[in-house]
Amino acid sequence: APFSLATA
């Protein structure tokens, strides 16, 4: 899955 600007 592509990375988003939000951290998990």
Swiss-Prot record:
Catalytic activity: urate + O2 + H2O = 5-hydroxyisourate + H2O2
Free-text function comment from the UniProt entry: Catalyzes the oxidation of uric acid to 5-hydroxyisourate, which spontaneously decomposes to form allantoin.
Regulation: Inhibited by two structural analogs of urate, oxonate and xanthine.
Location of the active site: T7 (charge relay system)
Signal peptide: none
Similarity section: Belongs to the uricase family.
Keyword Oxidoreductase belongs to the record: yes
Single GO BP term: urate catabolic process
Subunit structure: Heterotetramer.
Record's protein name: Uricase
Molecular-function GO terms, alphabetical: urate oxidase activity
Binding-site positions, urate: T7
Enzyme class: oxidoreductase
Enzyme Commission designation: 1.7.3.3
pH profile: Optimum pH is 9.0.
